[in-house]
A protein has these predicted regions:
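Fold-independent oxyanion-binding glycine-rich loops
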Residues: 1, 32, 45-47, 67-69, ...
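Active-site diphosphate/adenylate-binding microenvironment
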Residues: 4-83, 89
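General structural feature for long, well-ordered alpha-helical segments within catalytic domains
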Residues: 24-28, 38, 49, 104-107, ...
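Short gly/pro/ser/thr-enriched loop/turn and capping motifs at secondary-structure boundaries
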Residues: 50-51, 71-73, 101-102, 126-130
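Short glycine/serine/threonine-rich phosphate/pyrophosphate-binding segments
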Residues: 75-77, 100-107
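A short, small-residue-rich loop immediately preceding and capping a beta-strand
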Residues: 89-103, 118-123
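Thiamine diphosphate
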Residues: 113-175
Length: 175
């Protein structure tokens, strides 16, 4: 049944429409998965990024880690650190939204203290995106508590922890 599911996923056409002025998150996850090692561990945080990851990540022989439907925002950083400690020779990539990342970014200090190389992808949209999407559909665009105005400059956060940083702005920069 694994082969059957793989065939269905390969034939799946994502019909969602995204603003062409921004990076298409589904295409990004597909491209990212094609660049990852065969045995890589992909850690998906909670939110829209989790949905895009579940729909578009193509796993080879590694693992896909997520909290499922438990809604534990901030999961990806400590989970990735734990996986890195357990599997020091395996590529680890953690994908999260800007809200989730901020919920446990202090754990970057732990990562640096123990010299644990992990790649983080922050899908930044300036909102608690999945909560905002729910409020859009359920409360007819009456939003409350979803804006992330005042978020830090993530390049400066990376610099403060001695981490490399790259900002992807357009779809043609993915390769």
């Amino acid at each position: 049944w694994n082969e059957e599911l793989a065939e269905k996923k390969a034939a799946y056409v994502d019909r969602r429409h995204f603003n062409p002025d921004f990076v298409n998150p589904c295409r990004f996850v597909q491209t990212l998965s094609s660049k990852m090692n065969d045995d890589a561990i992909y850690v998906a945080d909670v939110g829209q990024n989790q949905l895009w990851s579940a729909d578009n990540y193509v796993m080879k022989h590694g693992r896909f880690l997520t909290t499922g439907g438990f809604g534990t925002m901030g999961y990806s950083i400590p989970a990735a650190i734990g996986v890195r400690a357990a599997l020091p020779d395996t590529q680890i990539v953690a994908v999260c939204g800007d809200g989730s990342f901020q919920m446990s970014l202090m754990e970057l200090a732990t990562m640096r203290q123990w010299t644990l190389p992990i790649k983080f992808v922050i899908m930044r949209n300036g909102y608690l995106g999945l909560v905002r999407e729910y409020q859009h559909h359920t409360y007819h665009d009456r939003y409350s508590g979803v804006s992330l105005d005042g978020s830090p400059d993530f390049e400066k956060v990376a610099d403060a922890y001695g981490l490399d940083y790259f900002h992807l702005e357009h779809n043609d920069e993915m390769e």
